[in-house]
Amino acid sequence: MRALVLLAAATACMAMPGPQSFPASLPASRESDQTTLGNKIHELGMDVSLGLQKSGNVVVSPLSISALLSVLMMGSAGRTHQELRRGLHVEDAHSENDFHHSFQRLMEDISSDGPDVTLNIANGLFLQRGAGIIYNFTHKARTHYNSVVSTLDFNNSSVASTKTINNWVNESTSGMIPNLLTQPLDPLTTFVAVNTVFFNGKWVTPFDPLMTTDMEFDTGAGKVQVPIMSGTFAINYINIPELKAHMAAFPYKGGRQAMYIILPRGQPIGNLEALEQELSAEKINSLIAKMRPLEMRVGLPRMRLSFKSSLRDTLKKLHMGSMFNPAAANFSRLTTLPVWVDDVVHETVIEVTEEGTKAAAATGALSFRSGNSNIFFVNRPAIIFIRDEVSGVPLFWGKLVRPEPLRT
């Protein structure tokens, strides 16, 4: 028996914000389909984030993980197929066909390569030469997920094959993830599936780099110095007393995507964990619909968030375990060989900066105590996510506990 390896990589680079703008709309039926799919992707992302049970930063791409597992679902059968379908919140076989078509339309609609916003979703299928991969699977993967299909020789050239995959990921993420695979693949590998999501967005109006200065960030376990960007902006905002938190939205140029930050009040860490458990897709959508513009004094870390983890144990906890079991995995719609999944590796990198990242940071004190009572100051752990505003798909979802300072 031979192993499948699943890899998901996601990167985001952004410069900081200005006034609100509004996304273009889709035809009603298409928008409804994408909203339904967006909720499914959101729920899976929440399942994974909560299942990871990490104490530090956690940043995942629900879109990337969903796309990867969706491709795998097309090649599965029996119990493995049922588990993947339930994990992706797909109700039945008929809904599965609609699911793949909706995913195809979603990727076509949200992908962008403009001067202000780039969103690139790439799927790579790397197959062992002569491994008996079923044509119908690769055909559907190309059709619905725009997958690039390549053949490699893992059996005799595992080091070179690993380098080829790393180079593909590096190019797809514009150099932000150069070495997703840190060790050569097992020579018995039959199939490697990779999904990457690269997002680079500019805010409508950037922060002034001269207003960036080092300040304290309270992690809950201690205080660290990080560069804090500041400004006064009209942003969409909501106070959430029932969750002991408040939320602000920061849109990107074009209005199709926005970053949301949910900031708990009170104790930094305990409230963050409890808060995430309350945030279903339905709850998030309801809160966003109630947000209203408000002029606020804003402070955000100039930071890098990076996260890399195996998702094998997490997916097992989410009842998607048979694909990892050589005796139980069923991928008979993918290959004529008896194969199983060895691991699912996910890496995410997010960078948050002003638009002019080469500008020198300012020196001097910064006060959030005078002149403006409307303050949204991210100086403690928060939930952060980047969302497609039309479909509701979370491109990235994270728990910010300790920002990595990103300095000029």
Question: For the regions a protein language model found, what residue spans apply to each?
Answer:
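Structural recognition of the beta-strand scaffold that forms the well-ordered cores
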Residues: 67-70, 126, 259-261, 385, ...
